[in-house]
Amino acid sequence: MAKSNKIFTNTLRLLALAATVVAIVFMVTSHDSAQVLNLTFTAKYSNTPAFKFLVIGEAIAGGYTVISILLSFKGLFWRLIVILDMVTTVLLTSSISAALAIAQVGKKGNTHAGWLPICGQVPDFCDYVTIALIAGFAAAIIYFVLLLCSLYVVLSPIFVATP
């Protein structure tokens, strides 16, 4: 792999790592409470399985990112990198999708099910979740670009080879 391509992919991996760390930090620290009819309502990420899934997915992606930066992959190992980049991209996409669905219900509610929006009562919680979702989307997009770069590295010899 060319040195410029290695620098580019490592830079993208560092950006992805930063995005996953930001998503984890903001999601884990998202909590707020409100007083409703003399009852204290506390909103925190650990109350929702989808938000836990986001944190776990981002943590796995961040761990894989650190490993992929530290190890030097050459030759046949790039095929493994393509597979792991694809798995990471799918994991990030699914975890962000699940968290976004729950965040949408929290923000807008669901009149058909009788669920009221909660962001009016716990705005700090919703703001932190929004930042975590934005960072999670950034990580997923960066990993999609990394997947395309990895595919290019693996497949370019096939298309460039002369008969």
UniProtKB/Swiss-Prot annotation:
The keyword Transmembrane helix applies. Homodimer and heterodimers. The keyword Cell membrane applies. InterPro entries: CASP/CASPL, CASP_dom, CASPL. It holds the Pfam family CASP_dom. Residues 28-52, 101-128 are extracellular. Residues 1-6, 74-79, 150-163 are cytoplasmic. The chain crosses the membrane at residues 7-27, 53-73, 80-100, 129-149. Glycans are attached at residue 38. Signal peptide: none annotated. It is a multi-pass membrane protein. This is CASP-like protein 1C2. Belongs to the Casparian strip membrane proteins (CASP) family. GO terms for cellular component: plasma membrane. It is found in: Cell membrane. Keywords: Cell membrane, Glycoprotein, Membrane, Transmembrane, Transmembrane helix.
